[in-house]
């Protein structure tokens, strides 16, 4: 039996990151049911869009159903967009302090958090991209350091890590991209 809050659509979010999964579910559900699968997908090198589209196509083929994949960038304006789509590896190698040190010689600490989701209805369906951007700046780590670079990305006086999760989920780059996905589902997938 369908209830007013029952999900009308279902996607398999391809991630092994429980923090990302929690955020995506908090933003999309109950309108879109979010299941999770962990696939070891090799990421090509390229632009954020190329990486996300490639991951989505391969995930749709493996899952044989509707998939949602995500790729995130942290772009330092002083470094012409670096680390960009390679933030995961920069973060693993350098940590919060090392990322701050990359900007030590620059007055400009501004940055963009960019999130790109790709949705595919399944094998053979061309993925659709949804991108969200939040402008902020890089600061010394503040708040819990347990979710990537959240502790060094400041938006309007608070780092993502200092924010209440519900507040972050209303302004983040991930939220902005998922809002576009929700809008698309509402228009394109309406009964």
UniProtKB/Swiss-Prot annotation:
Residues involved in ITP binding: 15-20, 55, 71-72, 88, 147-150, 168, 173-174
EC number assigned by the record: 3.6.1.66
UniProt entry tagged with the keyword Nucleotide-binding: yes
Gene Ontology CC annotations of this record: cytoplasm; nucleus
Biological process terms in GO annotation: deoxyribonucleoside triphosphate catabolic process; nucleotide metabolic process
Entry's cofactor comment: Binds 1 divalent metal cation per subunit; can use either Mg(2+) or Mn(2+).
InterPro entries named among the record's database cross-references: ITPase (IPR027502), ITPase-like_fam (IPR029001), RdgB/HAM1 (IPR002637)
Annotated protein name in UniProt: Inosine triphosphate pyrophosphatase
Cofactors, names only: Mg(2+); Mn(2+)
Molecular function GO labels: dITP diphosphatase activity; ITP diphosphatase activity; metal ion binding; nucleotide binding; XTP diphosphatase activity
Main enzyme class: hydrolase
Subcellular location: Cytoplasm; Nucleus
Pfam families listed in its UniProt record: Ham1p_like
């Amino acid at each position: 039996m369908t209830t007013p809050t029952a999900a009308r659509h279902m996607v398999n979010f391809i991630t092994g990151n429980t923090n990302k999964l929690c955020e995506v579910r908090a933003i999309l559900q109950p309108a879109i049911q979010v299941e999770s699968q962990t696939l070891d997908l090799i990421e090509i090198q390229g632009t954020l869009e190329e990486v996300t589209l490639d991951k989505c196509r391969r995930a749709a083929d493996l899952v044989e159903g509707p998939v949602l994949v995500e790729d995130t960038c942290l772009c330092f304006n002083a470094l012409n967009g670096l680390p960009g789509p390679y933030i995961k590896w920069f973060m693993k190698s350098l940590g919060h302090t090392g990322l701050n040190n990359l900007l030590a010689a620059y007055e400009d600490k501004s940055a963009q958090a960019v999130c790109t989701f790709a949705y595919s209805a399944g094998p053979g369906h061309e993925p659709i991209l949804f991108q969200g951007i939040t402008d902020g700046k890089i600061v010394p780590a503040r708040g819990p350091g347990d979710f990537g670079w959240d502790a060094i990305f400041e938006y309007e006086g608070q780092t993502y890590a200092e924010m209440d999760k519900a507040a972050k989920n209303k302004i983040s780059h991930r939220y902005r991209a998922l809002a576009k996905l929700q809008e698309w589902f509402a228009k394109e997938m309406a009964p």
